[in-house]
Amino acid sequence: MPVAASAIYFLNLRGDVLINRTYRDDVGGNMVDAFRTHIMQTKELGNCPVRQIGGCSFVYMRISNVYIVIVVSSNANVACGFKFVVEAVALFKSYFGGAFDEDAIRNNFVLIYELLDEIMDFGYPQNLSPEILKLYITQEGVRSPFSSKPKDKPVPNATLQVTGAVGWRREGLAYKKNEVFLDIVESVNLLMSSKGNVLRCDVTGKVLMKCFLSGMPDLKLGLNDKIGLEKESEMKSRPAKSGKTIELDDVTFHQCVNLTRFNSEKTVSFVPPDGEFELMKYRITEGVNLPFRVLPTIKELGRTRMEVNVKVKSVFGAKMFALGVVVKIPVPKQTAKTNFQVTTGRAKYNPSIDCLVWKIRKFPGQTESTLSAEIELISTMGEKKSWTRPPIQMEFQVPMFTASGLRVRFLKVWEKSGYNTVEWVRYITKAGSYEIRC
C-alpha cells in the first residue's frame, strides 16, 4: 500500500511553516495548527513519530532544525512514508551541497517547490533519484539538460530514464576500465550459554556493489542459495551438484532487480545503477557457522576475591584470520585490583564500563587463546548483595568468511559492445550482538 499523502509540511522548531505542498483536497488548511497544538505544544515530539488526530494521521521526522510532516487522511503504509522522507532529504542535500536545514530551505524554496512537484504526484511517491532528476532540474531552476551537454559524451535521454524501465541509470556512461566490485557483508548475532549452548543465533547480511561499467549492461548473479540451485537443476533436468546450500530468509532487493525473472528462474538479474548501491539484504536463522566459541569460568572466592578464566577459540579456517578482536569481560563494580595473564594480545581493566577489555589485533583460525585473571574486591559492610553477571561481549571482523556460508557462484556481465570486465568479490563477517553468558 503506497503513502497516499494529502499534504507535506516543512516546519522549523517554533512550528512556523517554511514550505508546504497540498496534493489532495481531502484535508483542510488548518492541519498544521492541529500538529502544533496537539504534538509540538504538548512536548510529545519525541514519543511517537506517528500520531492520529481526528480523521488524519501525522507522520513526522526531525532532520537538523526542521520537522518534515506528512498528513495522511486514509490508511497508508507508514514505513513507505518514512522511506520517502529519508530519500527526499538525500535528494535535497544533493542539490544543496550536503546541507539540509532551515537556512537551506529558505535559500532554495523555489527549487524545493519544483522538486516536490516531481517526486510526488497526487500523494504517491515518484522518482527520487538525484542522478535522473538533475538531468532536467538544475540548480538554477527549470533548464533543459541539452543546453549544457558535453561535446565528448552522448546526450542522455532524460525522457527514457524518467518514464522507462531503467530510471536508475543514465545512458552514455563510458569507462576506460570496466570493473565490478561485490562485497558480501554479514553481521552475526549470538546469545550463548556459559556451557557453550547456543540460545539464539542469526545472521543479517547485505550485498554491496560498485559498478563502473560502460553502456547499459545486464548482470546476472548466482549464489549458492537453496532455491536458486534447485531451480537451476530443474531447468537443466539433472540433480544439483553436491555442496553446501543455504536458505535465505527475509530477502529484499534493490529496485533494479528483475523480480519477474527472480520469481520464475530464481536468479538475480539486473541493470545496475552507476557507482555504489545495495543490491540486496537478507537474514539467515539456520545453519549459521559461528566464527568464535567462548568458554568462560568465573569463581567467586568469598566476598573479596574472584577468579576469571576465559577461553576463546576460532572456528573458521586455519588460513583465515580475524582482525580487531575485542572481548569485554564484565566484573563487579567494587573491583579494586586486577591481575591477569593472556596468551595472546593485551588486556586491561576499564573501570568506566566495569569490564576487563581484552584486545587481539590478529586472531588466526583454528587456534585458541586464554585470559586468566585474579580480581580483588572492595570489602563492604552489611549483607552481601549478589552480583548479576552481565554477558561477555565480543567484537571482531573476519575477512573472506561468511557465517551464513553464502558464496558467489558466478557474476556475468553482458553488454552489446562486448567489452571485457573485471569482477572483484570480497566477503566480510562482523560481530553484531555477540554475547556469551557467564
UniProtKB/Swiss-Prot annotation:
It is a peripheral membrane protein. Subunit of the adaptor protein complex 2 (AP-2). Adaptor protein complexes function in protein transport via transport vesicles in different membrane traffic pathways. Adaptor protein complexes are vesicle coat components and appear to be involved in cargo selection and vesicle formation. AP-2 is involved in clathrin-dependent endocytosis in which cargo proteins are incorporated into vesicles surrounded by clathrin (clathrin-coated vesicles, CCVs) which are destined for fusion with the early endosome. This is AP-2 complex subunit mu. It is found in: Cell membrane; Membrane, Coated pit; Golgi apparatus, trans-Golgi network membrane. Residues 177-437 form the MHD domain. It comes from Arabidopsis thaliana. Keywords: Cell membrane, Coated pit, Endocytosis, Golgi apparatus, Lipid-binding, Membrane, Protein transport, Transport. GO terms for molecular function: lipid binding. The gene is AP2M. InterPro entries: Adaptor_comp_med_subunit, AP2_Mu_C_sf, AP2_Mu_N, Clathrin_mu, Clathrin_mu_CS, Longin-like_dom_sf, MHD, Mu2_C. It comes from the Eukaryota. Belongs to the adaptor complexes medium subunit family. GO terms for biological process: endocytosis; intracellular protein transport. GO terms for cellular component: clathrin adaptor complex; clathrin-coated pit; Golgi apparatus; plasma membrane. Pfam families: Adap_comp_sub. The keyword Membrane applies. Adaptor protein complex 2 (AP-2) is a heterotetramer composed of two large adaptins (alpha-type and beta-type subunits), a medium adaptin (mu-type subunit) and a small adaptin (sigma-type subunit).
